[in-house]
Swiss-Prot record:
This is Sensor protein kinase WalK. It comes from Staphylococcus aureus (strain NCTC 8325 / PS 47). The gene is walK. Residues 382-600 form the Histidine kinase domain. Forms homodimers. Forms homooligomers. Interacts (via N-terminal region including transmembrane domains) with probable virulence factor SpdC/LyrA (via N-terminal region including transmembrane domains). Residues 314-378 form the PAC domain. It is found in: Cell membrane; Cell septum. GO terms for cellular component: plasma membrane.
Amino acid sequence: MKWLKQLQSLHTKLVIVYVLLIIIGMQIIGLYFTNNLEKELLDNFKKNITQYAKQLEISIEKVYDEKGSVNAQKDIQNLLSEYANRQEIGEIRFIDKDQIIIATTKQSNRSLINQKANDSSVQKALSLGQSNDHLILKDYGGGKDRVWVYNIPVKVDKKVIGNIYIESKINDVYNQLNNINQIFIVGTAISLLITVILGFFIARTITKPITDMRNQTVEMSRGNYTQRVKIYGNDEIGELALAFNNLSKRVQEAQANTESEKRRLDSVITHMSDGIIATDRRGRIRIVNDMALKMLGMAKEDIIGYYMLSVLSLEDEFKLEEIQENNDSFLLDLNEEEGLIARVNFSTIVQETGFVTGYIAVLHDVTEQQQVERERREFVANVSHELRTPLTSMNSYIEALEEGAWKDEELAPQFLSVTREETERMIRLVNDLLQLSKMDNESDQINKEIIDFNMFINKIINRHEMSAKDTTFIRDIPKKTIFTEFDPDKMTQVFDNVITNAMKYSRGDKRVEFHVKQNPLYNRMTIRIKDNGIGIPINKVDKIFDRFYRVDKARTRKMGGTGLGLAISKEIVEAHNGRIWANSVEGQGTSIFITLPCEVIEDGDWDE
């Protein structure tokens, strides 16, 4: 496996890193170049078509001024034919204010003249008096092409008299961009090949001295300190080789002088940053450092000469003979007033003959570590709250399958599909919780999608309704389809948090209400989730979105709350340009309000 060893060498790694840096640099440059080039080409194309359309608009206005709307049709047809001789123009139509097609440049569409245009973009241009554009796919005889549709209303005396509808073939722009990209890729490949060759030789000059030092290290580990590393230059590698040779020489000189005191010095030097207590063979304290005095909260004169086990309050638990046999460490409360906790390690000082000459106790302050451990356990408990809902839902479907639903050819695949979706969402949910700090730094990615909110919220309610048999769910959701743009996984987490809290704190005849209202004027909707629970004191309502805040710690822990769910929900909602707040009356229940951007879509609103 010589080739595998060569692949793992520093020389190969340097070449790989060098090549990767070049690749990354070229990718960044290529991405920047391509994006800007595409934008520039598209902008120029649209600018030319727009100027072309404005010239046609001026010509049509003159025809209307001279001949009026009744006698202008033939002249307009001639104008459109003159302006349609450009290669990128697919078709030009003129549509009057009543959406009637007056003229078209496409021979096959002449049958559409004097018929009503049903295109929503035309209707929008006529009603608003403003130009608009969009992309469509259309077949001009050679397969589907990308077509840029541009509408510009024609006005006479500030009144809209019609609309110019232009279809322009934008595919040539993308073909030109693809050709440029191919040239760039070939150039990158050639540069990469040259980079690999240069990287191999450059890495060789760096790794050769390091390889020599590695070989010398192997010899030193065998006790051979006579060899020296060859110095190739005066750079950092050369200085390192010189320092390595000096080190080898000093180790050789020090080895003979330190062997007899090695065990004692190693024990003391290794633990100097901790509390050190050294005793004689009878257990009386002879040496103690300042850290040990500080940890014990005692003066040196109150310790020297006393029994170590008595000072540590361990005389009832251990004997000196047991220390020699038991090397396990344990925690000890040294200073209850300051809450100081230390991990104590005992070791014995033994001569070569096996005679015990003393004992050493090492006190390591683990107060902060213990506090971190407590916080870690609390964090794990908090995270478990966020995982409970998907696990419960999965359990419900699995139980249904175990009870016989697997035999149903329609239900079984649906149940398995939902179970798989919940498993994947649970994994993403854990990652989101662990990356809460990324949300603070605005580095957490939001993957937005166009969502049918009615279907989205009903699906969530249905899932909770299946797992919570003792809770009544009341829905007040508009029949009109509401579309919004957000990350479905993160917003599912928000609604799961709010609904779970509503069910958890409801009392008696549990009831959770869902009210959705939209405000078309501002393109926003408000979701209200109300429970009949225990409520929140008015002076604490604004604090429930703080991280790890609990209204009643004992009650919240008993019910499994973490104090983290609503804080995460607030971060997610605000990342979607929304807002979340609460209203509550103690003893009567709590309402959580969420506002999000939205758009109500009715029939005919989509572009054809």
